[in-house]
């Protein structure tokens, strides 16, 4: 393993990551599929408004300007988004679409109806993630509602104005959670065990493997905050029933319904903050 890859690292669930479809304005039948944590900036790159970035395919043949028409978002990692992106680009062969359900049989450019149908098919394979779909074009939204290929999809889909949607994307704020954690001794409201995030002594850790082994022993477990209460994610996740990952959980103290994707975003950042400070590490974000 290289020295760079062996540095201590923790996974942070991104504030935002999405897979998008662009449509060329001068050549409406031409489309492009990509992924990004910043849709507004990425569109500017594709259109040449920013000198750095973009993609060769969106620069050539008089296809500019482009407009973003569809954005699937809510991915828990860049890797998950890239998997969805690759599957949407290669819907004719991806393992994430069952052969008997496949509607795209070749790598040739497919219609917007087909792309929307493939999104519907892919969400079944990615159903453990709290995905949502934003559409920024009224005609494309009409196609989604029409559902030409009659494929069921339980992922919420909403028509937005592009700029308004992008302006609504916010970084995850953990200040309130930090204040609760620092303010008093917390017990898990499910198992009642003390949440020990502040230790009298900590080991010297210099590698990713050492940090992984230390956390695997139960040190700095992922925790969630609701009001001034806390819980181990492993405890409250038992509400999930047969699902591997819950879509939401209910606070056992106040009864509030909590979105799992929001909980995990705060939880991974809170642990990153405490571990980095307590172990005196410069931790890489995965």
Curated annotation (Swiss-Prot):
SUPFAM superfamilies: GIY-YIG endonuclease, RING/U-box. The keyword NAD does not apply. Gene3D superfamilies: GIY-YIG endonuclease (3.40.1440.10), Zinc/RING finger domain, C3HC4 (zinc finger) (3.30.40.10). GO terms for molecular function: 5'-flap endonuclease activity; crossover junction DNA endonuclease activity. The keyword Lyase does not apply. Belongs to the SLX1 family. This is Structure-specific endonuclease subunit SLX1. It comes from Candida dubliniensis (strain CD36 / ATCC MYA-646 / CBS 7987 / NCPF 3949 / NRRL Y-17841). The gene is SLX1.
């Amino acid at each position: 393993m290289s020295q760079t890859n062996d540095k201590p690292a923790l996974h942070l669930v991104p504030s935002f990551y999405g897979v998008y479809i662009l449509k060329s304005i001068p050549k409406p039948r031409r489309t492009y599929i990509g992924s990004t944590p910043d849709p507004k900036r990425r569109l500017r790159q594709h259109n040449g408004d920013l000198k750095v970035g973009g993609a060769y395919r969106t620069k050539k043949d008089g296809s500019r300007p482009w407009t973003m028409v569809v954005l699937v978002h809510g991915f828990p990692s860049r890797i998950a988004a890239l998997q969805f992106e690759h599957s949407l680009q290669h819907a004719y062969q991806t393992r994430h679409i069952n052969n008997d359900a496949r509607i795209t049989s070749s790598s040739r450019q497919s219609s917007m109806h087909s792309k929307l149908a493939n999104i519907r098919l892919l969400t079944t394979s990615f159903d453990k993630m709290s995905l949502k779909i934003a559409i920024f074009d009224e005609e494309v939204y009409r196609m989604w509602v029409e559902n030409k290929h009659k494929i069921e999809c339980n992922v919420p889909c909403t028509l937005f104005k592009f700029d308004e949607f992008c302006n609504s994307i916010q970084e995850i704020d953990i200040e309130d959670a930090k204040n609760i954690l620092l303010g008093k001794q917390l017990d898990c409201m499910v198992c009642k065990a003390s949440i020990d995030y502040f230790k009298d002594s900590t080991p010297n850790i210099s590698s990713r493997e050492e940090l992984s082994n230390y956390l695997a022993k139960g040190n700095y477990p992922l925790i969630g905050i609701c009001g001034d209460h806390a819980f181990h994610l492993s405890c409250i996740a038992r509400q999930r029933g047969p699902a591997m990952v819950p879509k939401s959980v209910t606070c056992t103290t106040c009864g509030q319904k909590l979105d799992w994707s929001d909980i995990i975003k705060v939880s991974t950042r809170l642990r990153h903050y405490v571990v980095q400070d307590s172990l005196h590490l410069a931790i890489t974000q995965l």
